């Protein structure tokens, strides 16, 4: 049966609103643009800290660019939120853990493992620091598997005994809102998820698109 994760989130937010007191939330973020509309929406219900743990980002220059953009976004929006940086060790925390899945297509088992790595570490950190909830912004992307994300969140909620904020953040135009905020703030918005495999796939799609457009142009000129 298909689960409405947006509805599950709204039920949790309703309870928090009725309690009259904000809860503490540690939310995993992959980048500033993806977190923008999520934070805008959730700040009315939570005291939020951002956990920037992304060992899947292969290149250190890309990692630094996304981290700095995350911090800069909070400054521009004047959000009273802390960015907690996790350990950045792609070799041990990503490549070692996805061995054997290198040739998987984007959206498959390798991505599941990547979500698992990051959400699991977020749950662990949230438990250690006594947050009321943990979550991730990953479901803001139309390209991400919302079932994978929430199933993993539920798994670690049970393991660490801390509530997971279920979500399908792209719903109710929040993805479009994230794009709008990114443009308004002139934010750096990356063109691939983060790992070298997603970068290679993106470059391949671009080449195929360019070739199609070239062929279509030649047909029109005949």
Which ranges hold each PLM region?
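Nucleotide-activated chemistry modules centered on ATP-dependent adenylation/adenylyltransferase
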Residues: 1-222
């Amino acid at each position: 049966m298909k689960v409405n994760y947006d509805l599950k989130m709204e039920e949790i937010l309703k309870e928090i609103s009725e309690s009259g007191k904000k809860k503490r939330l540690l939310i995993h973020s992959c980048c500033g643009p993806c977190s923008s509309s999520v934070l805008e929406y959730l700040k009315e219900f939570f005291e939020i800290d951002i956990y920037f743990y992304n060992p899947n980002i292969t290149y250190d220059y890309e990692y630094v660019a996304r981290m700095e953009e995350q911090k800069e976004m909070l400054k521009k929006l004047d959000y009273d939120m802390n960015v907690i940086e996790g350990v950045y060790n792609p070799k041990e925390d990503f490549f070692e853990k996805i061995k054997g899945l290198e040739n998987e297509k984007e959206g498959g088992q390798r991505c599941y493992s990547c979500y698992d790595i990051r959400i699991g570490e977020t749950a662990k950190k949230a438990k250690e620091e006594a947050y009321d909830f943990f979550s991730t912004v990953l479901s803001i992307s139309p390209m991400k598997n919302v079932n994978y994300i929430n199933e993993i969140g539920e798994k670690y909620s049970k393991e660490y005994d801390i509530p997971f904020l279920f979500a399908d953040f792209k719903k109710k135009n929040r993805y479009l809102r994230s794009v709008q905020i990114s443009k308004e703030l002139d934010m750096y918005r990356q063109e691939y998820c983060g790992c070298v495999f997603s970068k290679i796939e993106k470059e391949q799609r671009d080449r195929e698109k360019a070739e199609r457009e070239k062929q279509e142009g030649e047909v029109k000129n005949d």
